[in-house]
Amino acid sequence: MAEKKEKIIGIDLGTTNSVVSVMMGDEAVVIQNQEGSRLTPSVVSWTKEKEILVGEPAKRRAILDPENTVYESKRFIGRKFEEVKEEAKRVSYKVVPDEKGDAAFDIPNAGKLVRPEEVGAHVLRKLKEAAEAFLGEPVKKAVITVPAYFNERQRQATKDAGKIAGLEVVRILNEPTAAAMAYGLHKKDNVRILVYDFGGGTFDVSILEGGEGVIEVKVTAGDTHLGGANIDERIMDWLIEEFKKETGIDLRKDRTALQRLKEASEQAKKELSFKMETEINLPFITIDPNTNQPLHLQKKLTRARLEEMIKDIVDRTIDIVKQALEDAKLKPSDIDEVVLVGGSTRIPLVQQRIKEFFGKEPHKGLNPDEVVAMGAAIQAGVLAGEVKEIVLVDVTPLSLGVETYGGVMTVLIPRNTPIPVRKCEIFTTAHDYQTEVEIHVLQGERPLAKDNKSLAKFYLTGIPPAPRGVPKIEVCFDIDADGILHVTAKDLGTGKEQSVRVEISSGLTPEEIERIIKEAEEHAEEDRKKKELIEAKNQLDHLVYQLEKALKEAGDKVPADVKSEAEKVIEEAKKTIETATEIEQVKQVTEKVLQVSSKMGTTLYGEAGKQAGGGEKKDEGGEGEVEAKPVD
C-alpha cells in the first residue's frame, strides 16, 4: 500500500484578510475557518483578561479598543522603525522601535512589546488549526505568499512568523505568481498575462509569461498604500461629513460610532458591486448633546456617486499598470489575458477601466479573494509530489548590489531577474595595503548607495597587504527559491571568505524565535484551560437557572427540607461561578446541583402522582412535572 503523503497547505497571509487552501485530488480547496468563513481578517486583539482574539472577533474591536488591536501588521513585518515612521501614523496602535531598531507594537493589554512576526503567527496558527480540523490530521508545512515587492528581510520575517505558528515554511511565493498558477497559466502555450491585484491594503501588478509547463514573472510594480481600505475610508468620510452638515456633530470623536461606520462603509462598497444603489441605515448612531435624544444616520449611496468618490484611486492603479507595461517594453495589445485578484476587483468601475484599457474582458473565473491561496496550495501540491509538470520562475523585484568606491551602488542582480539565481563579480581594494574590505549590500534602483536600502554590512579580513588593485575579491550573490539572499565575499589569493544571510540584520534571532514559540505554547495551554473553565461555568449557570425555575414553578409542592437544600446549593453555585479559578471546583458544585435537581424531580414526580390519583388539579401538577424533567 502506498504511503500517505504529508499534506502541505497554501496560505495567503494578506494585509487585510488571510486565506488557507489545500490540494484535494486535482483541486485546490479553500478551507473555512472556525467561524465558518473562508476569509479570516488579519487582525489580532488583546483583552484586559489577557485573552488573544484573532480574525473576525478581533476585527470587531478595532475601533472600540484601538490601542490593543493590531491590524495591517503586514506593513511592518521585517522592517526597521525608521522606515515605517509614516506608516505608524496611519494606525491606531502604538508602533515603536525594539532593542534592535525593528518595528514593534506597544500593546498595553499584552504587557510587552509585540513583534509583527508574532501577530502574523497568531493569524497563521488560526489558519493551521482550521486546516487540521478540515483534514483530520496534523499540519506541519506550508507555502506562504508575499507581495512581489517584499524584500529579503520581509520574506525571512514571514518565515519566522510561520515557525512561531508551528509551521515549516517550505516556500515563500510571490502573490501574482500564485495567482498565475491558480489560473492554470502553465497549461497554455506562449501566453502573456497581466495580474492586477487590488487587495485590501496593497496594489500590485505583475506581467508573466507562460508555456510548456513554465511560468516566468517578467515585471512587477505596485503601491503599498493603495487598496480597498482607501475606498472604505472615502465612503466613511462622506458619511461623517453628511452627518455633520445635518446635525453639527462630528462622529470621528465617537469610537463606537466609528466602528459601526467602518463596517457599514465596507458593506455598502460590497453591495454597490451588484446593486445600483444601497441604503446605509445606522439607528442610534449617537446622542444629541442638546436634547439628549438619540440620532439616526440614514443615507442612500448610488453606484454613480461612489464612482465619483473613487475615480482617482482607480486612475492610480491604471498608472501603475502603464508603468509595468513600460518596464516590460510591451503595449496593452501585447497582453493575452488579464487576471483580477483581490476583493476590490469586484468593483464595476475597476472592471470597466481594465476592459477599456486592454480592449478585452478581464478574466474573472475564480474568486478574487481566494485565487492567491489556491495558487499557494497548487505550489504546495508540487512540493508534496501531488501536482506534476509545473516549473515556476519568480523574479527579484528590485536590483541588488554592493557599495563600491565613491559611494556608488554596483548592481550584481538587476531588477526583474528570474530566481533562483547566482551572480558573481570580481572587485579589488581601493587603497594601498588594505587588509580588510567592507561589503555593504544594497537594494534599489538609485545609482548612489545612500539613496538605496541598506540590507547588510559585513567585513572580509585577513587580506595580505598589497598595492591597491592587486587583491582579487570575488563577491557572489545567491538568491534561493524563497527570494532569500545569501552574500559571500572571497579573497581569491588566500581562499579566505565571509558570508551573510541578509535577513539576519532585521529578522528575529533563533533564540527570540524559540522564546516566542515557547510563549505561544504556554499561552495556548492557558487558553485551553481558560476555555474549559468558562464552558464548565456556563453549564453550571444553566443548571442553576433550570433549578431556580423549577423551584419557582413548583412553589409549595417542594418539601421544606428539599427547598432549603436547593437554595443553599444555588447560593454556593452562584458564588462558584463568580470566584472559581479551577475547573475541579466547578465540577464538584455542578455534581451537587445535579443531585439536588434529581432529588427535587423525584419528589415532584411523586407528588404529581398523588394528585392525579386523588382527582386534584391535573393541569397544574402536569406543568410542574414537565418543567421539572429537564432538571433530572
Swiss-Prot record:
Spell out the Basic and acidic residues composition-biased ranges.
Answer: 615-632
Chain ranges passing through the membrane: none
What is the role of the protein in this entry? Acts as a chaperone.
Can you name one GO molecular function term for this protein? protein folding chaperone
Recorded family membership: Belongs to the heat shock protein 70 family.
Q: Where is this region: Disordered?
A: 603-632
Which Pfam families does the UniProt record give?
HSP70
Q: Any idea what this protein is called?
A: Chaperone protein DnaK
Q: Which GO terms describe its biological process?
A: chaperone cofactor-dependent protein refolding; protein refolding
Task: Name positions with the PTM Phosphothreonine.
Answer: T202
By its UniProt entry, which SUPFAM superfamilies does this protein fall under?
A: Actin-like ATPase domain, Heat shock protein 70kD (HSP70), C-terminal subdomain, Heat shock protein 70kD (HSP70), peptide-binding domain
**Alphabetical keyword list:** ATP-binding, Chaperone, Nucleotide-binding, Phosphoprotein, Stress response
State the conditions that upregulate or repress this gene.
By stress conditions e.g. heat shock.
Q: InterPro entries per the record?
A: ATPase_NBD, Chaperone_DnaK, Heat_shock_70_CS, HSP70_C_sf, HSP70_peptide-bd_sf, Hsp_70_fam
